[in-house]
Structure formats: structure tokens, C-alpha cells
């Protein structure tokens, strides 16, 4: 039982680390696409680009931002699940009252 619990905890930790890494990567990509969309819009304003290209770039930037926000939620969920399983959020009855077992 102890090995199973340790293996589950290790897997949960790896998942939390991977989720955070994925979120950071998504955030960097979203920031880059937002800068690209800004430049594309500026080119259109100066008459050097087409509206369709500008709108497509803006759409991609918005989709990347949405993906980054979703990845951030996934990372936070993984982190808080890890904290919950580690009993870092609040004391369980057994932790607060050793020897007392609820009915």
C-alpha cells in the first residue's frame, strides 16, 4: 500500500510539473502571436497589408490566449490537487485529532 501511495504521489507531482511547463510554453506562444498580430495590424493601418491577414492574425492570437488560459487552469488544478493530497490545504480530522475516528 505504501508503495502504491508513493507512486501515485510521484505521478501527481510529475503531472503538476508538466502542467506548469505546458502553461508557460502556451503563455510564451500567446505573447509572441499577440506581438505578431499587433505588427500585422500596424502594417494594415499603413496600407502595407490586407484586412483579411490582420483579422486572421488577431484570431490566432486570441486562440493562443485562450489556450494559455486553459493551460493555466490545468496547471492550477494539478497544483491544488497535489496540495490537497499532501494535506497542505487543511487538516483532516485524523490529523487534527489523532486517535479519534469519526463514526
Kindly give the residue locations of the regions a language model identified:
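Amphipathic alpha-helical coiled-coil segments
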Residues: 1-67, 74-85
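Terminal intrinsically disordered/low-complexity segments used for targeting and assembly
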Residues: 81-103
Amino acid at each position: 500500500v505504501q508503495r502504491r501511495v508513493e507512486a501515485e504521489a510521484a505521478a501527481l507531482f510529475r503531472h503538476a510539473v508538466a502542467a506548469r511547463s505546458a502553461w508557460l510554453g502556451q503563455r510564451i506562444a500567446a505573447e509572441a502571436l499577440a506581438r505578431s498580430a499587433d505588427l500585422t495590424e500596424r502594417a494594415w493601418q499603413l496600407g502595407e497589408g490586407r484586412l483579411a491577414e490582420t483579422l486572421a492574425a488577431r484570431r490566432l492570437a486570441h486562440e493562443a490566449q485562450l489556450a494559455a488560459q486553459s493551460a493555466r487552469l490545468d496547471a492550477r488544478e494539478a497544483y491544488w490537487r497535489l496540495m490537497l493530497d499532501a494535506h497542505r490545504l487543511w487538516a483532516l480530522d485524523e490529523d487534527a485529532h489523532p486517535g479519534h475516528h469519526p463514526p
